[in-house]
Amino acid sequence: MRSLWIAVAMYSKLPVPQVEWDRKSLSWALCFFPVVGVVIGLLLGLWLELCALLDIGPWLRAAGALLLPVAVSGAIHLDGFCDTADALGSHQPREKKLEILKDSHTGAFAIICCCLYLITFFAVWCEAEPAGGAFWVLCLGPALSRSLSGLAACSWPNARGSGLLATFTQPMDAKRARVVLVLWVIGCCAGMLWLDLWAGAFTVAGALLSFLYYRVMSTRQFGGVTGDLGGFFLQICECAMVLQVVLAQRIEVLL
């Protein structure tokens, strides 16, 4: 249970018991990262149900759906998105990009990209129709994005070989962790397809394409992954999944 509490304490603002961060507990902590996504998905489902019950309009519904994950996670992943945007926007050599990721200052690229991202994600949520199976497909998105992020962390090289991400990956049994996280990914994908085959297929495709982009970008630009890059991927993946649900719903109407 200590690994679970460490994962929840690290990747969310949810109140959990304080435990010692020993090597044994850290070795399994990343495997519980998707649990935070499950909690966010449940809260998201409650919010969307409340919006439907009270006939709340798309703007307020979208604002809540956008802000809820940020509030629960403490914006830790959005911070990584901003740091990565600064690094990519600098067009500097790899070593300099890694230094920018560690810089606590916020640059112009981070502010611009963050604003554009939030506007885009808000607009996408406004277009989503949380009805039928697609409703619950949307709620599985946060768990799938975190499963893929964790899988990348324990499968791909660490760009720095140190840092917060290394705190979790160095003590772990990488093979066992990969098995657990692959099972998380399979479970989330299977759940999406079972809930709504059409919307689920689009959503899974969006998540996997985001994962492929993450692999190519992180390798070419940084030589591996970091915690900030993981946050960048997670934000991109979640926006892509909601966008895919919107596309699935629109195409289904045309057919």
Q: Model segments located where?
A:
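Hydrophobic alpha-helical transmembrane segments
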Residues: 1-74, 92, 96-98, 103-255
